[in-house]
């Protein structure tokens, strides 16, 4: 499998970061296709619906969930007046569905994390297309020799 790991700090509080990353009102801002329903996460887009297991949900600490056959997590920790966010995706090499393969999926999460950082720093969300190009190119080079 592949492991995509991204670590960054934001000037937002732990509570603000958690609210954005792990609540329905937060998802509405950066990933409106997601909703928490009981102990599952529901992804709905253009007639497609997938119910994914919520694997961990520790308030202000960690959210982890199945993402198709991958596992995605956000872990939060306090750093003085900042919050450290660690994103991880463990993704099988044969990951794939009608929308994405492993590379496209990782590109999407790299873009999402840039957007999350901007939201938490009170900035306008970036235009996604140039970010997709940047990260797609980066991953092509990274995965080339594997």
Predicted regions: what is each one?
Residues 66-118:
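Beta-strand/loop substructures that line and gate deep hydrophobic ligand-binding cavities in soluble
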């Amino acid at each position: 499998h592949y492991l995509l790991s991204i670590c960054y700090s934001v000037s937002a509080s732990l509570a603000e970061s958690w609210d954005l990353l792990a609540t329905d009102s937060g998802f509405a801002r950066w990933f409106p296709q997601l909703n928490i329903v009981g102990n599952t996460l529901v992804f709905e887009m253009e007639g497609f619906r997938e119910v994914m297991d919520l694997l961990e949900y520790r308030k202000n600490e960690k959210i982890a969930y199945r993402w198709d056959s991958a596992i995605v997590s956000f872990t939060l920790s306090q750093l003085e007046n900042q919050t450290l966010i660690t994103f991880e995706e463990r993704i099988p090499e044969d990951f794939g569905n009608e929308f994405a393969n492993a590379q496209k999926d990782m590109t999407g999460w790299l873009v999402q994390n840039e957007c999350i950082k901007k939201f938490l720093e009170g900035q306008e969300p970036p235009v996604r297309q140039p970010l997709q190009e940047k990260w797609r190119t980066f991953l092509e080079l990274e995965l080339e020799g594997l």
